[in-house]
């Protein structure tokens, strides 16, 4: 289960030998330009933080604590400042906040951003192991004169960085890096090879452009005077599956319900994408029951292409149309459902916007259709849970289970 939600944008820079305050207006303007490049990720609010050695900027899509949750968030301890810009969502905010309150911390917001900053101040750099969620964030620690970049375990939230004239730059998207004076985009040879050979995929850490790197999933970076260190706090491992079929069903059921329920926590209404497939139907069923318990009705959306009923052809990926299964779901669950449709001209016109949104070549009409439909859904809901990525996790694609594809020789 994956979500189309919580898309704030973060950006900034760091120079251990810098003195940004001497030219405050200039560097504040650079920070503003960087978050303006990310305004499509969140245009509810924006903010900047500037010290002698670092600058942080944030473009906010307000989901939690809409009134007092503006970023960057700045706190003090023993006369030293700590600042954070954050993109993501925690699913164990209350548990962490409870432990921190017992240790004497007082919260002035209900955001998970403040919880993360206090957790760092209290537990130290490895606090990230306690986080359950999706995130990319930067923390400035004035007590140690260091900047830290963190990324979630599987890389749901993007975070790129580069070095220009001895300065560290970071941002949610490469385009914001190129707002820094003197840094222009240039595709690297390795990046071009990957685009042509395995695109739209790319190897982890490859930013496609020259001198653009990506913080690896499950990693955090520490930048201080003359040093940069890369730390792994989580890594995927494999082990024999010894559970029985019944135990496996029970475990997967618990994990799905726990995951979806935790992601329903929001200060704005949550909806789901309902394609009629198994993945989105399970997410919708769990979300619908959650909403019913709270006396609310879930908004659901399904998407189709104009004249798909005429031109649809069965294939290995989609043996039959989804629409009949959407109707079956709606017979079983009471939701506020909206059918959305897209024609080929709209799909084509959104192609450039889709590439611009990702800064990389992508899945062509898959990306452009999703971007277009999301723009329609946003008129009703800011937060959407989807069934995206379930095929990757549960082996839903044909090459996971069809014998002739498993045994085929070839690359990729």
Question: What are the residue ranges of the model-derived segments?
Answer:
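Cysteine-centered catalytic environments shared across enzyme families
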Residues: 5-357, 370
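Residue-level signal for short amphipathic helical patches enriched in basic/charged
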Residues: 91, 361, 380
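Active-site adenylate/phosphate-handling loop in enzymes that bind or generate adenylated species
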Residues: 153, 347-350, 364, 371-412
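Short loop/turn hinge sites at secondary-structure boundaries
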Residues: 199, 359-361, 412
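Short glycine/serine/threonine/alanine-rich loop segments
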Residues: 335, 360, 382
